[in-house]
Amino acid sequence: MLRSVLGVIVGYIVMFVLQVIAFMTIYTMMGADWSFKPASYEASTAWTAMQFGVILVTTIIAGLICAAIAKGGKAPLVLAGVVLVLGLALAFASTALRPADTHEIRAGNVPNMEAMSKARHPAWVIFLGPVIGAAGVLIGGKLKRRG
């Protein structure tokens, strides 16, 4: 039981850290003009596609690590549930508390933290992320069982 709980906790932390590192690195390398639509803080199509790819890869890794630590059982399923429930809760909070578009004009490059705080995504993107994440965890958990 302790291994399962530890697997879920470590898996979630790994997922979070990998996503922060990936998004900050990609934004730093690609810049604001690639990440956002022209003169706005609305995420570009390229950023949205990359975002889903990062979510899938990092959650597969998290599911794999969770399953490896738990050594069997339903820990990856629990982690997938945590990713889905927390992700959807944050999505609901985000859409309820933040306007979809502030019509703020972005001028050139902006620092990473400003980009994160001002970025806007369509609602479907915000709600699809946790679903992709939960699926990734389940895939990673199954990979460990096969290996």
Residue ranges and their predicted role:
Residues M1-G147:
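Juxtamembrane/disordered regions of integral membrane proteins
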